[in-house]
Amino acid sequence: LELYKKAAALDSVYGFFNVGFLYWNGPEEIQDPEQALQYLKKAAQMGYTYALSFIGDIYRTGPEELIDYAEAKRYYQKGVDVNEINAIKGMALLYLLGQGVTQNNAMGAFYLKKAADKGNAWAMYHLGRLYYYGEGIPRNPKLALDYLQMAYDANYPDACSLLGLLYERGEGTAPNIELANKLYIRGHELGDDQSMWYLACNYLDGNGLPKDYKRAEKLFIQAIERGNEPARIDLARMIFHGLGTVQDPQKAYEIIKPCLEQGYGRAYMLMGEVYENGLGVEKDYKQAKELYRKALDLGYSFAQEALDRLDKFC
């Protein structure tokens, strides 16, 4: 830091930038966002366009007393005007998150495409996601596949799981479960929790892979440890059914409980199945119906069939 300060004192643009960068993103004990702004603005004034996105980031993400979305947009726009890749990403985030502007995924996609066209893997992945889910733009699995493949080719780990899902479901391409599982395995190697979850499900159900309950259980646990909440539902399913493990409804409930608290419809669906079929608990069709109804209220449409089935019992 002191060496860069000496360079800044000699009016070195790199000195100003590096001091600003360290004050913003350096070791915690020297971080000082206000000082970072001063040095980064000086670097930007001297024509160092790379500083523009960092200034925008400080105004966009804080600390709270410095958040100013209008200023963030102003500096990002300066960067966009000179095709600075990180400023383009910052502008995309403003629109995708609705920070200081009306939330607009179409505008977000516009800036993501600009960044993707410049070879940015993060933008390729997020543009692929938008096209896959059709969030604010027309759903287009083929374009999703194209952008996710580009992100994967650029070694972006998160692309593995969604690209694999497209091949597994045959969306935008012919179904190819073998390739899907290879992508999940690669994602697992790269630490992608979603890939771990999908791979575990396929080991559990024997989908393109030999059934392997122990491997499935291990992968579900790894995914959960990395913050993948839906994997809890499938691990609980294994334990409620006693698949490759001792049936233990109390343990299974403790695993699935956070998903129930967070309103996952599929979690309520599983609990309905537990009471309908007496999986380690006494059968209770009334309780099952209440749980299926909750799942349906949370948007899990498959619960309707279960409700219709139970109508003849209660």
What are the roles of these predicted feature ranges?
Residues 1-3, 30-39, 65-75, 102-111, ...:
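Structural signature of tandem alpha-helical TPR/SEL1-like repeats
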